[in-house]
């Protein structure tokens, strides 16, 4: 298990607040099983894996947001189909 420091992550993120928000969102994606890790899992918790991905420069807001958009598209498509049905 590799140790991850805040300083390692701040090389790829602007500030600590952004780091917390990004790590939280990514760790939730990993914990729910919806997304595959971009680094070896190594028996770590989802939060540690998310921080390791950020420190390695593999995950940023664009990657996390893009994965969310792909996940939400079918939900909105089904909602729009129901809204267009005649009453």
Swiss-Prot record:
UniProt entry tagged with the keyword Nucleotidyltransferase: yes
Keyword Transferase: yes
Entry's Gene Ontology cellular component terms: DNA-directed RNA polymerase complex
Biological processes per GO annotation: DNA-templated transcription
Assigned EC number: 2.7.7.6
Subunit structure: The RNAP catalytic core consists of 2 alpha, 1 beta, 1 beta' and 1 omega subunit. When a sigma factor is associated with the core the holoenzyme is formed, which can initiate transcription.
Protein family per UniProt: Belongs to the RNA polymerase subunit omega family.
Main function: Promotes RNA polymerase assembly. Latches the N- and C-terminal regions of the beta' subunit thereby facilitating its interaction with the beta and alpha subunits.
Protein name in UniProt: DNA-directed RNA polymerase subunit omega
Organism of origin: Ectopseudomonas mendocina (strain ymp)
Gene this protein is translated from: rpoZ
């Amino acid at each position: 298990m590799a140790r991850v420091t805040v300083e390692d992550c701040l090389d790829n993120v602007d500030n600590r607040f952004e780091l917390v928000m990004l790590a939280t969102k990514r760790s939730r994606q990993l914990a729910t099983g919806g997304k595959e890790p971009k680094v070896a899992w190594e028996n770590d918790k989802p939060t540690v894996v998310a921080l390791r991905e950020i420190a390695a420069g593999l995950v940023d807001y664009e990657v996390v947001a893009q994965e969310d958009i792909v996940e939400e598209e079918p939900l909105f498509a089904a909602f729009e189909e129901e809204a267009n049905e005649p009453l």
